[in-house]
């Protein structure tokens, strides 16, 4: 189980990078809030995700953080403010 967050500087180059990073993350994980994704993902898919992201992330200004856990049940999800527990995979 992984939680991924990213921060892309929105300069001219970043505005072009941001949609690509979003699409890559959405391909592997569930979009839960702005630049936050979560989901169960295998080790080979984590490797593929990271390799795809490395093509776009500028090491000097952008960042991606992956939090990993063996199981989602080991995490407590708590909302402060809007409790929008919908995932983007549901229509």
What are these regions (language model features)?
Residues 1-3, 8-91:
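Basic nucleic-acid-binding interfaces
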